[in-house]
């Protein structure tokens, strides 16, 4: 699984996932399923944000190519992917600027159009079960929840899906592609089942050999949001990143 993750995801996503795991004392080489899950979640958060802006009238617009007008403001502030200290700094800055209630837990995004924090979920299980788990943990109506599954299902607070259908379809397609790529390499079952994952881990540790059949090339095409990893994510210089294209798994 580790080799698959490093081949399938953008190197910047992989690096962020590694840092996040190490921050909590976890080893990506051992907890490979969690490594894959974190990379997937990061990519969904970035795709959620990509290309969405607010114009001078306060309307949400999509700009997919070229440099948008400097007056445009990014609709979403990305919080996921930061170390905890910087993430809370961003959250506090947003709360002080907008007057919204500070969340108890770190959210993934902030939506400047709807003036709300967003919690993104990506699940291998039933979306409604994962949604309820998120809601019970957060216990706040102020944070919007949006759950995606690898089967194309989704669930959001009050059925408000925030994004347009095409933008959500991109995310669903990417998740389905990841599932298919895992399945073709015999990794999906262990990714879904903890029991199977433990069995696979013991086998991998015993063999200590790289997985066969993995693609030999890594895509270095960077999602626009990945180019925004500066100390604070609130300036308009991020717009030049729109020239980049979405990352996709490369097949051998």
Curated annotation (Swiss-Prot):
InterPro entries: PA/PA-X, PA/PA-X_sf
Site (Important for efficient shutoff activity and nuclear localization): 195, 198-199
Active-site feature positions: 80, 108
UniProt entry keywords in alphabetical sequence: Decay of host mRNAs by virus, Eukaryotic host gene expression shutoff by virus, Host cytoplasm, Host gene expression shutoff by virus, Host mRNA suppression by virus, Host nucleus, Host-virus interaction
Protein localization: Host cytoplasm; Host nucleus
Highest taxon of the lineage: Viruses
GO biological process entries: viral RNA genome replication; viral translational frameshifting
Residue numbers marked as site, Important for efficient shutoff activity: 202-203, 206
Gene Ontology MF terms: RNA binding
Function according to Swiss-Prot or TrEMBL: Plays a major role in the shutoff of the host protein expression by cleaving mRNAs probably via an endonuclease activity. This host shutoff allows the virus to escape from the host antiviral response. Hijacks host RNA splicing machinery to selectively target host RNAs containing introns for destruction. This may explain the preferential degradation of RNAs that have undergone co- or post-transcriptional processing.
Family statement drawn from the similarity comment of this UniProt entry: Belongs to the influenza viruses PA-X family.
Domain topic, free-text comment: The probable endonuclease active site in the N-terminus and the basic amino acid cluster in the C-terminus are important for the shutoff activity. The C-terminus acts as a nuclear localization signal. The C-terminus is recruited to host protein complexes involved in nuclear Pol II RNA processing.
Protein name: Protein PA-X
